[in-house]
Protein backbone atom coordinates (compact mmCIF):
# COMPACT_ATOMS: atom_id res chain seq x y z
CA UNK A 1 0.00 0.00 0.00
CA UNK A 2 1.42 3.35 -0.95
CA UNK A 3 0.73 6.83 0.33
CA UNK A 4 -0.98 7.91 -2.88
CA UNK A 5 -3.70 5.29 -2.40
CA UNK A 6 -4.14 6.35 1.21
CA UNK A 7 -4.55 10.04 0.35
CA UNK A 8 -7.57 9.13 -1.80
CA UNK A 9 -9.39 7.48 1.11
CA UNK A 10 -11.73 9.18 3.56
CA UNK A 11 -10.80 9.47 7.25
CA UNK A 12 -13.35 6.77 8.12
CA UNK A 13 -11.81 4.41 5.59
CA UNK A 14 -8.37 5.19 6.99
CA UNK A 15 -9.50 4.42 10.54
CA UNK A 16 -10.92 1.11 9.33
CA UNK A 17 -7.66 0.34 7.54
CA UNK A 18 -5.71 1.17 10.71
CA UNK A 19 -7.87 -1.21 12.75
CA UNK A 20 -7.25 -3.97 10.20
CA UNK A 21 -3.51 -3.33 10.28
CA UNK A 22 -3.46 -3.50 14.08
CA UNK A 23 -5.27 -6.85 13.98
CA UNK A 24 -2.84 -8.10 11.35
CA UNK A 25 0.13 -6.93 13.38
CA UNK A 26 -1.19 -8.68 16.49
CA UNK A 27 -1.74 -11.93 14.58
CA UNK A 28 1.74 -11.77 13.05
CA UNK A 29 3.36 -11.21 16.46
CA UNK A 30 1.39 -14.14 17.85
CA UNK A 31 2.53 -16.36 14.97
CA UNK A 32 6.13 -15.33 15.57
CA UNK A 33 5.88 -16.15 19.26
CA UNK A 34 4.56 -19.63 18.47
CA UNK A 35 7.13 -20.21 15.73
CA UNK A 36 4.62 -20.34 12.88
CA UNK A 37 5.66 -17.15 11.08
CA UNK A 38 7.53 -17.90 7.85
CA UNK A 39 8.39 -14.33 6.85
CA UNK A 40 9.27 -12.02 9.77
CA UNK A 41 9.45 -9.03 7.40
CA UNK A 42 5.64 -9.03 7.35
CA UNK A 43 5.65 -7.63 10.90
CA UNK A 44 7.78 -4.69 9.82
CA UNK A 45 5.59 -4.07 6.76
CA UNK A 46 2.38 -4.06 8.82
CA UNK A 47 3.90 -1.70 11.38
CA UNK A 48 5.10 0.72 8.71
CA UNK A 49 1.76 0.62 6.87
CA UNK A 50 0.03 1.50 10.15
CA UNK A 51 2.43 4.42 10.60
CA UNK A 52 1.63 5.64 7.08
CA UNK A 53 -2.09 5.53 7.81
CA UNK A 54 -1.63 7.42 11.09
CA UNK A 55 0.50 10.06 9.37
CA UNK A 56 -2.08 10.67 6.66
CA UNK A 57 -4.90 10.79 9.22
CA UNK A 58 -2.98 13.44 11.15
CA UNK A 59 -2.28 15.41 7.96
CA UNK A 60 -5.96 15.36 7.01
CA UNK A 61 -6.97 16.46 10.51
CA UNK A 62 -4.43 19.29 10.47
CA UNK A 63 -5.53 20.53 7.06
CA UNK A 64 -9.19 20.40 8.11
CA UNK A 65 -8.40 22.40 11.25
CA UNK A 66 -6.38 24.94 9.28
CA UNK A 67 -9.15 25.48 6.74
CA UNK A 68 -11.72 26.26 9.45
Curated annotation (Swiss-Prot):
Coiled-coil segments on the chain, per record: none
Molecular-function GO terms, alphabetical: structural constituent of ribosome
GO cellular component terms listed in the entry, alphabetical order: cytosolic large ribosomal subunit
Gene3D superfamilies (UniProt xref): 1.10.287.310
Domain of life assignment: Bacteria
Short name of one Pfam family: Ribosomal_L29
CDD domains linked to this entry: Ribosomal_L29_HIP (cd00427)
One Gene Ontology biological process: translation
Keywords: Ribonucleoprotein, Ribosomal protein
Disulfide bond residue pairs: none
Family: Belongs to the universal ribosomal protein uL29 family.
Protein name: Large ribosomal subunit protein uL29
Species the sequence originates in: Roseobacter denitrificans (strain ATCC 33942 / OCh 114) (Erythrobacter sp. (strain OCh 114))
